[in-house]
Each structure stands twice: as C-alpha cells, then as structure tokens.
C-alpha cells in the first residue's frame, strides 16, 4: 500500500513522538516502518521525533524501510537519537528506493541515514546531519546531487554495537561497505565535516566512489574525482 504523511493543521505543530526508551525485543523498532516491496510512504511535512533524554544509549529510530519498502521525503523533519532513516541488512535482494528531495534528517548521537540494505538512495535536496555523521552506507547505491547538504558534526558516538554503525568513525559519508559492494555517486550538493573525516571507506568490500560535482569542506574528496569533474572546495 501507499501512505502520505503531512501536517495539515494551521499551527503546523503535528508530531509523532517516541514515548519510551529503547528496550530490546519489546520497544526496539522505528516509529514508522515501511515493510514489503509493495509498501511505500511519502513524507510531505510534519515532525517525527525519536530522541530520548540520553540518546546514545536509549535512541530511538525514526523511519525504517524493510523487505523492499520505499520512502520519499519532500519536506518535514525527522529527528532521532540514532537513525532518522534506516534500512535493514538482512534484505540482500529486496531493493528499497529512498528519495530525499527536501526536509531535515537529524541524528543527535549517530548517523542520520543508515543504508545496510540493497537498493538505491538519492539525496537531491534537504539537510542531512548527525552528531557522528550524515550517511553510512553498507551496501547498494547512494546518489548525492542537487542542493543536498550532508554534514558530520564529528562529536557523536556510534557505540559498541556488534553490527550497524557500531565502532565506525565519524564522517559526512561513511562508505563502510561491510555487507556488500557500496557505490557512491556525488554529482552535486555540499558535504561538510565540522570535525574528523569528510569521506571514509571500509575494507571488507572495495567501495566505488565517483565524484563529478559538488562542494566540499576540505580537499580530501579530490582523490575520488573523475575526468571533467566540476567541484568546489570551501575550507571550514
């Protein structure tokens, strides 16, 4: 089925809230889960708040895509203690399509967007920023283009989880690739690392990183430049 989320109130104060801390096996999922290859959701406006008082240990998660579910965001705000938007690494053949054209995706402790699943994610607008990083990809394809702004605060902690982002370094984009080949195409947008790394790579699988455009906060992205690339470096 298809679902559209929007705040149609005059005050624009509608909010979906995580009312409990993370608890294994009982309160441990996303506030909204898009499950199945025929399931899709578009978020046009509104606010999803999954931040607990101690987010490093108590989360929570915002929107989850599983088993090939698709998510489109054209506006609104998702703020989470852990991942604002995330997939699940168990899904190797079911391809999820995620499109972010506007809005805000925020993590107060970790990475804002976590991509361990198969499929393609395109961020062409909006703001994506996390205390640890903007996007962590373990498998699949990530396209960054348009007016997208992806920022790593470099101050967060990914924790010591046995999977997920556990133990990973902070970066605007972390191409960890622990579950398969990860391809990142940066055609535009802006990447900022307020501290630590702009782009980091894993070693389990060899990632593919192509930079043909965009604006970067340090010159480390230049090593991924392709022929005829047009990039800007604005030091911070």
Can you say where each PLM-predicted feature lies in the sequence?
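Surface-exposed loop/turn motifs in large extracellular/passenger domains
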Residues: 1-82, 86-110, 114-131, 135-195, ...
């Amino acid at each position: 089925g298809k679902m559209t989320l929007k705040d149609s109130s005059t005050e624009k104060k509608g909010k979906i809230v995580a009312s409990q801390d993370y608890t294994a096996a009982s309160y441990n999922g996303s506030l909204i889960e898009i499950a199945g290859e025929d399931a899709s959701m578009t978020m046009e406006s509104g606010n999803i708040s999954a931040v607990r008082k101690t987010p490093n240990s108590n989360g929570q998660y915002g929107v989850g895509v599983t088993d090939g579910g698709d998510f489109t965001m054209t506006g609104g705000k998702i703020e989470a203690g852990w991942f604002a938007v995330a997939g699940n690494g168990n899904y190797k053949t079911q391809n999820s399509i995620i499109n972010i054209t506007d809005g805000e995706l925020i993590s107060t402790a970790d990475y804002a967007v976590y991509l361990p699943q198969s499929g393609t994610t395109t961020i062409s607008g909006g703001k994506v920023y996390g205390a640890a990083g903007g996007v962590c990809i373990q498998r699949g394809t990530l396209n960054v283009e348009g007016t997208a702004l992806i920022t790593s605060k470099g101050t967060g902690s990914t924790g010591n989880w046995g999977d997920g982002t556990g133990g990973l370094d902070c970066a605007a984009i972390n191409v960890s690739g622990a579950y398969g080949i990860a391809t990142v195409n940066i055609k535009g947008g802006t990447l900022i690392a307020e501290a630590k790394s702009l782009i980091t790579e894993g070693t389990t699988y060899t990632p593919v990183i192509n930079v043909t455009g965009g604006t970067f906060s340090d010159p480390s992205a230049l090593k991924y430049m392709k022929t005829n690339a047009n990039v800007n470096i604005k030091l911070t």
